[in-house]
Amino acid sequence: MQMIVTVGVILFGFALGVLQKWIDGSPSNIFPLLIQQLDLRNYFGRFAIWILLATCISIYSKSPLRASINTFLFFISMLAGYYLYCNYVLGFLPKAYMMMWVMISFATFFIAYICWYAKGEGVIAIIISSAIIGVLFAQAFSLTQGFYVYHLMEVVTWFIGIIILYRKPKEFVIELGLSVPVALIYQLVIPYWG
């Protein structure tokens, strides 16, 4: 069963990579107005959706090792689909940019192992889930240069992250409370990365 899930993750990643590059390489006016207004072309080029997908793959895996393997294979297959489309359909291959994403994909192996514990019990699980929600919060809202929304889709992504990492009410309040300083620190350390 785990092998079937892993194959599904690989196929999903590859298809998402091809879809992302197809959207990215298509004129925006071919899409319905709603898709244009939601700015899906750029949404997939920012980090929030990938953080959310990696979190989902991690926390719903059977073990921390399986979370690492599935998340890593998702990102590698997504990059394969993205850059194969880029090379063979669009006729170019940005190697330096590709290498940056490959390095991030390797990092996800270790990060996913830790994220698997976010749905667990206790203080460590609350801290991990707070960090995830905080990073998603930092992707959705500006906290350091006035409070405003960066992008609507990132707000939706943050809200979905809250739903999947929801805990008992008392723990949930702590989780959300801790996520705010995480978001603030994130924006102070890497203000424009996302």
Q: Model features per residue range: what roles?
A:
Residues 8-18, 135-139, 159-164, 180-184:
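Hydrophobic core segments of alpha-helical transmembrane domains in multi-pass membrane transport
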Residues 141-152, 158-174:
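Membrane-helix boundary connector in multi-pass membrane proteins
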Residues 183-194:
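Juxtamembrane boundary at the C-terminal end of a transmembrane helix
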Residues 84-150:
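Membrane-proximal helix-loop-helix units in multi-pass membrane proteins
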Residues 47-58, 104-116, 156-162:
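Hydrophobic cores of alpha-helical transmembrane segments in multi-pass inner/ER membrane proteins
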Residues 1, 57-69, 117-125, 165-175:
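Membrane-interface helix-boundary motifs at transmembrane edges
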Residues 1-79, 83:
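N-terminal topogenic module of multi-pass integral membrane proteins
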